[in-house]
Amino acid sequence: KEYRRQRQMCIRDSGEPTLYTRLSEYIELCHSHGMTTMLVTNGTLPKVLEKLDTLPTQLYVSVDAPNKEVFDEICRPKWNAAAWEKFDETIDLLPSLDTRIVCRHTLIKGRNMKPEHIPQYAALDNRADPDWIECKGYVHVGNSRENLTAENMPFHEDILDFSNALAPLTDRKLLDDSPPSRVALVGREIVPIPIPEATMYFPEDLGIAESVKHLKIIQ
């Protein structure tokens, strides 16, 4: 029942989504069910983005490094020696894509959010010309715990300081922020997301058994 009411599909986990060969078809299918789509990519496959027949409702590009040196240190590309160069291509491609664009900066204290990095991020953001810039704090979970520590998590005040310094360099302003999530939104204005018109519908009976919260203990 909850799945039939789904209105937003986030395409981001289980690896880089632009490696999926039927991505455009999947996005189109989501839109046909009246869902918005949010595609999160590391930007290292610009040709895939350029050739998508159907673009997502909103495209998030991870801009986690201000330059190649920091990129190689933090993102640590293993299979693509030219990852930074491909990412750089994506930055210049973004203004030509007819969809909502967000540049997301995941900020790691002591690594990629030093004062000298801010103008470099601004230069990338100005080239990409996104609708919004999202500045969010790194969270010490998952595999990142092998390389980083809890001390690398910035406070919300750090995120706000970074965002307020970045905003005027991109001719934007701080629009909103969330202290619990340690995230700030930089842009010119907040515009409601367009909802695709549904042309396909899920059947009333999906053939899925009702969930069981408590099972009897078998002695």
Question: Where are the predicted features?
Answer:
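Single conserved hydrophobic/aromatic residue that forms the stacking wall/gate
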Residues: 1-10
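Surface-exposed amphipathic alpha-helices with a cationic face
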Residues: 24-32, 91-96, 163, 167
